[in-house]
């Protein structure tokens, strides 16, 4: 199901998007504050109002949690144990795609930390999200729009596959897979493998919303058509991918601290980090 259709389904089933709307910020946390000041050249005294204004414009059109709760200014990529490797590899010329990148905020972290923008790609199904990223970071002159691709990862005829199939070294996926059911996630994983170079060391790094309580998980899926993993289902997903593709993969997973957990309305939620490397 398309994410927009999922949102409409959730609203029809009684979900109140106001639950996803956080009061305007009074401060902007690091590293986004410094990125906006130094990368985007937003005046120091305008940073907070700039972020609030972009959020309100975006939420009026797309009442998603990532927008309403300012997730786009709570960067997480640097919290991954794989970040130093991703940063060094992209500095050396390896190509990274942030799949489901929303505003492309994690790409700006990599650029701020020294990765050449031409080694980075972002893709989201919503072109408007990519545009809002430019509204937030004011950096069209730094990150060419040719590096950002509006596409559906399930559509292998899309510009994403036309341009990048077999060309990438790393794909980063953060809080995106849960919008697909288990079977669709298998397809997404297979498609992502097709975007990567077919060589040892090609890597997928994931940040996944997970749930320990299967009863809560089942109730959530009845109300909102999302699929939150637990560790067992996550491992089962990749075993199935290996079985169907014949590709040898090494999967490592861990629980990682995350601000999202503190404000998530469901009990038993945690963030599952994972790296999937081609052998």
From Swiss-Prot:
UniProt-recorded Gene Ontology molecular function terms: methyltransferase activity
Pathway connected to this protein: Secondary metabolite biosynthesis; terpenoid biosynthesis
EC number of this enzyme: 2.1.3.-
InterPro entries: Meroterpenoid_MTases, SAM-dependent_MTases_sf
Assembly with partners or alone: Homodimer.
Similarity-based family: Belongs to the class I-like SAM-binding methyltransferase superfamily.
Protein name (Swiss-Prot/TrEMBL): Methyltransferase ausD
Species of provenance: Penicillium brasilianum
